Amino acid sequence: MRSRSNGMGKIVGIDLGTTNSVIAVLEGGKPVVIANAEGSRTTPSVVAFGKDGERLVGQLARRQAVLNPQNTFYAVKRFIGREYSELTAESKRVPYTIRRDESGKVRIKCPRLQREFAPEEISAMVLRKLVEDASRYLGEPVTDAVITVPAYFNDSQRQATRDAGRIAGLNVRRIINEPTAAALAYGLDRQQEQTILVFDLGGGTFDVSILEVGDGVFEVKATSGDTQLGGNDFDKLIVDWLAEDFLAKEGIDLRRDRQSLQRLTDAAEKAKIELSGLLETNIDLPFVTATAEGPKHIETTLSRRQFEDLSQGLLQRLRYPVEQALMDAHLTPSQIDAVVLVGGATRMPMVQDLVRQMIGREPKQNVNPDEVVAVGAAIQAGILAGDVKDILLLDVTPLSLGVETIGGVTKVLIPRNTTIPVRRSDIFSTSENNQSQVEIHVVQGERELAAHNKSLGRFKLTGIPPAPRGVPQIQVSFDLDANGLLQVVALDRFSGREQSVVIQGASTLSEEEIQQMLLDAESNAAGDRQRRARIEKRNRSQDLINRAERQLREAAQEFGYQFAAEQRRGIEALVRQLQEAIRNEDDRQIDLTYAALEERLYDFIRQLRLREEEAEDDEEVFKLPNLREAVNKGLDVVRGRERRRDDDEDEWAEPPRTRRSRSYSQRADSAPWDDWDDDW
């Protein structure tokens, strides 16, 4: 997918998910999901640091989570772009440690490295893994991307996602809402006009968007959601059910132990997935803890009915955003033409039943809920690169944007569900006589009081000429771009003085922090490349050892152990040296011995080939197959006589021991070719 305008390389589409992430690209005008290095089309959004400080991302990180809970980080998307004070108690209940720094931001503690990470840094590591795998697949470096976010992400969370992309070394060309991306994937080839409801229940977030799709136009009419509701919350219901039952029986709260909590979390996720296809599932956790009486185990059964009863509160929370989106779009459920389910959590039968009940329509099952968002992001990337034509995407802002006025009241400039990009302005004045400056406090949310909304930032306009209160005219303009990122301009219409700011959000990173994290990421990437190179070097060395041993073994079977004896001894010595260098992790010695063994093995194989060619010439000259046949016939006669003589002996008697075995150096193919002699 090359941009025709600037000759740039591929632009990829990335679904940066709470639980799993996916990367896709347009090839030949069609979106293709790129498998990772492990061969999977989805990559767990998990980062871990092993015992030697090595960084693990994806499935490798997830596998060791139970044994390394404090240094394994998942569901970080729930923390990105948020202040510590905004986090719920549930979101903070993870096996690793999250804390508040001096400025109120979220920090993730890594005991293994004795340092702390911002959520953006952890997300950047997942992005870098996706991009490196995509670069290997495409055969060229990937530098540009479209990244999706939940539709209900506020400005801070969007900016933080963009920062994560920058830390990963990406030029983030566009931030696009996940439901909108899903609608792009679903409606790309559909010409008839339809009203689509996208129900997006991911691992940690929930969005509902309503779009009108037809003739290449994708117009978002309304969006709603809950950024603290997702499939992980259903897992936690099972965790609590298991933990409370164990607490009642044994008096031990497993949630207080990090390793036990991780085991409960893994078992809960597994049970949730199984209950999508089964009516009940067994949960077995041996040695989950121990007391003075000995080890303790969990052995229980959870039915789908029990799980649904546990989930009633969460199902009720899913209802409100659907109702709100329908209300904002001025539509009834009967006016929805299609329902598209997005996110792995929508596989739960009770969620699908809820959608059927609320909309009165069967959800579409012809899209992959795990991949459809990344596919839509790849289509948006194709639009930006000029590879996809005649597509117009009209998205909306999910939350109202405004400023704080006298008394702490919010004055909305851009209402929620306004089509973006958009520019709106309003006139304000001073609240005191001879006021020389005003502070602009930008907020986002639906509450009447600014203190109850999300603070996005503050800046001051100074140099206002002295005048009675209410006389100066201060024009405040909001410019919201297609990425959902906001620029605010304040202008004194009398003096012409102007002050502008790109809202970074109160809980996102400063430019200095981003640059430092980018340097750290590049440094870590270099270390990762070095570790990978060492691993590949050892793998190549072991392959060479295996090849050398195989060649020696085959040569001995064909020509005997005396064949090229001096070269054989040299190869065996080099094999031992290389094995020792691998054990000692001596990179220089590995390189030297590898080269020497490779050269010695090449000479040995060349000599072996010459010997094989000589053997083939001998067989052609002396008609060896006929000779062998004659020898075998003669032996058959001798054996026949021996068998007739032995018929009179006891059949249980010990066999004669006088038969001579083949000499150690005799060629295997010089023995008679019949089954009778196989035991010798």
UniProtKB/Swiss-Prot annotation:
**TM spans (from-to):** none
List the SUPFAM superfamilies hit by this protein, alphabetically. Answer: Actin-like ATPase domain, Heat shock protein 70kD (HSP70), C-terminal subdomain, Heat shock protein 70kD (HSP70), peptide-binding domain
Per the record, the similarity remark reads:
Belongs to the heat shock protein 70 family.
Q: Quick check: keyword Manganese in the entry?
A: no
PROSITE patterns for the chain: HSP70_1 (PS00297), HSP70_2 (PS00329), HSP70_3 (PS01036)
**Phosphothreonine carried by residues:** T205
Q: What is this protein called?
A: Chaperone protein dnaK3
Instruction: Give the signal peptide as a residue range, or say none if absent.
Output: none
Q: Where is this region: Disordered?
A: 640-680
Q: Which Gene3D superfamilies match?
A: 3.30.420.40, Actin, Chain A, domain 4 (3.90.640.10), Substrate Binding Domain Of DNAk, Chain A, domain 1 (2.60.34.10)
One Pfam family recorded for the sequence: HSP70
Describe what upregulates or represses it.
By stress conditions e.g. heat shock.
| Main function | Acts as a chaperone.
